[in-house]
Amino acid sequence: IRELIKEGGEWQRFVPYDFEGCKPSFTRQAGREMLFKLCTASREDFLALPDCDEHLANRFMSVVSSCPETMDIFEQRIKSKNITMARVRRMILHLVLGIRKDDIRQVPYGRILAFNRTGTRILAQAENRTLEYDTSLKKLEDISDYAKRVAFLEKNAVRLRETAAYGRCVSNEYTRKITIT
């Protein structure tokens, strides 16, 4: 599907609902912003990342000091036989979004972004659930301090996606409408 989107192909038939008005985006489109964040990060910032150790933090700092011109160059310089590209990209996204080791815990809530009739029935029958579900980000972030932190990170992810797609933030997660299919 990603390749179809990149090439301008017919990808819509492979997704469950209409994405009208929602421009597809890829992290590459925010490459300059991401590279800036990487090049201004400290060793401590890298050490705070999930899945980062002393060796990787040193490797990141070494690449930062070489002033790579693009994200592709940055990633290639980090990647090695023992460090996969997927891991490198995940760590970069964690840094850009502000996700730290202590953020990776139990899921604090389930946010409903879209549903159909079947989903409506399932939610109505789920009386003894242990996880809070809602469509309102405001209600969900009021569950706990940790839920508020996760909601903040969720908003960061939306801002990154919108910056990549539109060059700026265009929506408010507190007023976002859910999709009913």
Where do the model's predicted regions map?
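Active-site cores that bind ATP or allylic diphosphates and position pyrophosphate for catalysis
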Residues: 2-181
